[in-house]
Regions:
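Solvent-exposed, charged helical/coil patches
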Residues: 1-42, 113, 119-124, 129, ...
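Intrinsic disorder/low-complexity segments
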Residues: 1-2, 56, 68, 121-160
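A short, glycine/Asx- and small/polar-enriched loop/turn
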Residues: 59-64
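Conserved catalytic cores of phosphodiester-cleaving nucleases, focusing on short active-site segments
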Residues: 22, 45, 67-83, 94
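Nucleic-acid nuclease catalytic cores
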Residues: 78-127, 133, 147
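A short acidic/basic microdomain associated with nuclease active sites
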Residues: 41-57
């Protein structure tokens, strides 16, 4: 599945959750509901996949993205009235640290669902990607990280 179709499906799942619940719940509630919708859509995902962050070759800690969908898209969820630059920076860092082609920052906290698409300019195929009409943000922060394989369950219905 190409990235355009994949992000379209993910956003559709998020819209269904937001249309059903509305705003006002804690982020973890939206995360659990989105996991249900991703499974129903037949999308493979890992939840809260951990990565080790290195600084100058030294392990300095770990980070966890809310979802890695189909091993290609980082999905970071928020449940805030307004997104701020710090949330966008966090999503940018995840896209680069996890070495994925793109990420989605999805906010369930406002009356209308908000999402931003974030491309990783360091990912080789992104040089040819086009903006699909969703807010395109280029991640450009230098970051060094290595992946730790997640032991979280991946959707067994996935064709991967």
């Amino acid at each position: 599945m190409d990235l355009n179709n994949l992000t379209y499906k993910i956003n559709g799942c998020a819209m269904k959750v937001h249309n059903t619940l509305g705003n006002g719940f804690q982020e973890v509630i939206y995360q659990r509901c989105l996991a249900i919708e991703l499974e129903r859509a037949g999308l493979g995902y890992a939840r809260e996949q951990e990565h080790i962050i290195y600084y100058d070759g030294i392990d300095v800690g770990t980070r966890r993205a809310d979802f890695v969908v189909e091993e290609a898209v980082i999905v970071e969820l928020k449940a805030l009235i307004n997104l701020e630059d710090v949330h966008l920076a966090q999503a940018k860092n995840y896209v680069i640290a996890y070495d994925k082609p793109l990420g989605l920052l999805i906010n369930f906290g406002s009356t209308s669902l908000q999402f931003k698409k974030i491309y990783n300019p360091k990912y080789r195929q992104n040089q040819d990607l086009q903006d699909f009409g969703i807010n395109k943000i280029n991640a450009n922060k230098d970051s060094i990280s290595k992946s730790n394989k997640s032991h979280n369950p991946v959707n067994p219905d996935s064709d991967k």
